[in-house]
Amino acid sequence: MNNRVLVSVAWPYANGPRHIGHVAGFGVPSDVFARYQRMSGAEVLMVSGTDEHGTPLLVQADKEGVSVKELADRYNRQIVEDLAGLGLSYDLFTRTTTRNHYAVVQDLFKGLYENGYMIKETTMGAVSPSTGRTLPDRYIEGTCPICGASGARGDQCDNCGNQLDPADLINPVSKINGETPKFIETEHFLLDLPALADALAAWLKDRKDWRPNVLKFSLNLLEDLRPRAMSRDIDWGIPIPVEGWQDNGAKKLYVWFDAVVGYLSASIEWAYRTGDPEAWKKWWNDPESSGYYFMGKDNITFHSQIWPAELLGYQGKGAKAGSVHSLGELNLPTEVVSSEFLTMSGSKFSSSKGIVIYVKDFLKEFGADPLRYFIAVAGPENNDTDFTWDEFVRRVNNELANGWGNLVNRTVSMAYKNFGEVPTPGELTESDKKILAQAEEAFGVVGEALAHSRFKQGITHAMHIVGEANAYIAEQEPWKLAKDESQRERLATVLWTALQVVSDCNVLLTPYLPHIAQQVHETLGRDGVWAAKPQIVEVTDDMPVEPIGVGIPEAGQTYPVIMGDYAAQQARWARIDVQPGTALSKPKPLIAKLDPELGETGPEWAPVNP
């Protein structure tokens, strides 16, 4: 097994700024995982981008009175700024309206088509009677015909987990305007999932390490596999590269067909932009490489069924066989890591209903790491979780400020005041050895949790060590030792021990709190970049594509991407010995305490009772 890890992160729609519910599901968990893997020595490739096709963008563009391209350009830039500000360490965060993405998507489609896994059928398509526009499956809701649950979507019922078609729903209505959709006959290309069922089942049944809810849901999908439409009656999207279809401006590829291909196209673009066009193959063609996919629970289907099926069919590994195409044998996901929903006042975040906290506003007032901490320790890892300002304030004040911030501040302050540097320790007592051993053992405990995407378990144990370190200082009472010259060696030993544990805890918390970790690194008298920050880079869409493809965008558009030189950072998953004699400076406050009243009212821009 090599040590290359692909971290594929769900693509956010470019139809509005991101709110904290979005980043709780796909953003922070994936970054914690990627940062830990890099610190452990893995060669990580973390990719994503803005999803700029599909009806959601058309609907929003209509609302704002702008073209879809204008809308996508604006929100692509806003989302890039949001995610970079949060410290998400993408090797490449790009977009789906690039020449490269069009070409790669069309290559995947043609491979599936030539292998017989894209079939033409006449289906019943839903359209809006008032606009004539196609309604996506997810924009139609009704009663599930199988279990009777209300609120079932046109693609699946979350209550029973069964796949549906919009025409299956009882009393279907459009989520856009509440009208009853009209169903018309239309011809589409469908992914022949039944022909790939055995291959999908064989792959899924080997996924022993997945979160139980994700694996159970994915296995249930196999029970009623039907061909699924991969084209849509829509004028905004990627053209269908088949004779007789490619010039039809009213039919495009389904947004979810092209979005999941984005993990591959982004990897190819990353390789080009870093000067080694073949480098992507190390993560995609080498079966020893691993790939982890992060998303919210509503997107499991596309990552544990649709995307693996596309990959299997492209390589001719279904019942119809077929050949391997130009991109070679491509790796299927090692694990699909899904989070539940972050809610507010018991409801899903909704901009239209005013139930929303935007990332941009949150970062401006509180910075990135308090939000990252909250999502890690109290977020929707395994269950839907309600965000409240009261809990946010309580956790920041009691855990981050009083716990971690206090440990760093008082340890470094006492060492600086009494020695001006990291002191030389004397003989260690059993108490010293115990806390040092606890901190060292935590690398294994927290590392094991992070390697298996158990982020809440990992940060809980790391903060337990912080608590043990604070208890150690309270027990040793170095402020009393400082008043007795005969206890100077013991004072030096206690403070050296505490500084070492601070250093250890900083390593443990780095994947979660990279911005604070850099501050602590400097507070301990160390130079250089400990935890690298992502950078926003303006690029030009000038990438050569072969084959050219159908209807691809013209070269020359410029757009922002997120990249970063993470290989140059010093952070590693191991004890970093504190060196006696290292100069210290008076520490600055690490984490500002919040006004408790904020927990009752919320900030002006997101009040508790709007």
From Swiss-Prot:
So what EC number does this one have? 6.1.1.10
Q: How is the cofactor bound?
A: Binds 1 zinc ion per subunit.
Which residues are noted in the entry as ATP-binding? Answer: 351
- Recorded protein name is Methionine--tRNA ligase
Q: Superkingdom of this entry's organism?
A: Bacteria
Q: What residue stretch is flagged as signal peptide? A: none
User: Known Gene3D superfamilies for this protein?
Assistant: HUPs, Isoleucyl-tRNA Synthetase, Domain 1, Methionyl-tRNA synthetase, Zn-domain
Q: Which residues cross the membrane?
A: none
Instruction: State the gene name recorded for this protein.
Output: metG
Kindly list the places in or outside the cell where this protein is found, as annotated in its UniProt entry: Cytoplasm
Q: Is this entry keyworded Cytoplasm?
A: yes
Motif 'KMSKS' region boundaries: 348-352
| Record flagged with keyword Repressor | no
Which family is it part of? Belongs to the class-I aminoacyl-tRNA synthetase family. MetG type 1 subfamily.
Any GO BP annotation: methionyl-tRNA aminoacylation
What reactions does this protein catalyze? tRNA(Met) + L-methionine + ATP = L-methionyl-tRNA(Met) + AMP + diphosphate
- Keywords associated with the record: Aminoacyl-tRNA synthetase, ATP-binding, Cytoplasm, Ligase, Metal-binding, Nucleotide-binding, Protein biosynthesis, Zinc
Q: What InterPro entries does the annotation carry?
A: Anticodon_Met, M/V/L/I-tRNA-synth_anticd-bd, Met-tRNA_ligase_1, Met-tRNA_synth, Methionyl/Leucyl_tRNA_Synth, MetRS_core, MetRS_Zn, Rossmann-like_a/b/a_fold
